[in-house]
């Protein structure tokens, strides 16, 4: 039991928050027409990547998800990437 707690404590210390990709590129407003940016937030299977994977804030994640859905409706992005 003690070993598990030590292992968990070590993992929590070494874990760093992910860098925000939108902030790094200087993007304030996510646009559905910017499909090159939106492709970074879609997995190879066509799923929208989670916040934990992308490092976005909750508000940015909602904006990206909405933009991806709009881009799919406008046929700028595929619904699946097979």
Curated annotation (Swiss-Prot):
Name this protein carries in UniProt: Small ribosomal subunit protein bS18
GO biological process assignments: translation
Keyword Nucleus in record: no
GO molecular function, one term: structural constituent of ribosome
Transmembrane regions: none
NCBIfam families: S18
Function in brief: Binds as a heterodimer with protein bS6 to the central domain of the 16S rRNA, where it helps stabilize the platform of the 30S subunit.
Similarity section: Belongs to the bacterial ribosomal protein bS18 family.
Domain of life: Bacteria
Any GO CC annotation of this UniProt entry: cytosolic small ribosomal subunit
Complex and partners: Part of the 30S ribosomal subunit. Forms a tight heterodimer with protein bS6.
InterPro entries: Ribosomal_bS18, Ribosomal_bS18_sf
Lineage, top ranks: Bacteria, Bacillati, Actinomycetota, Actinomycetes, Mycobacteriales
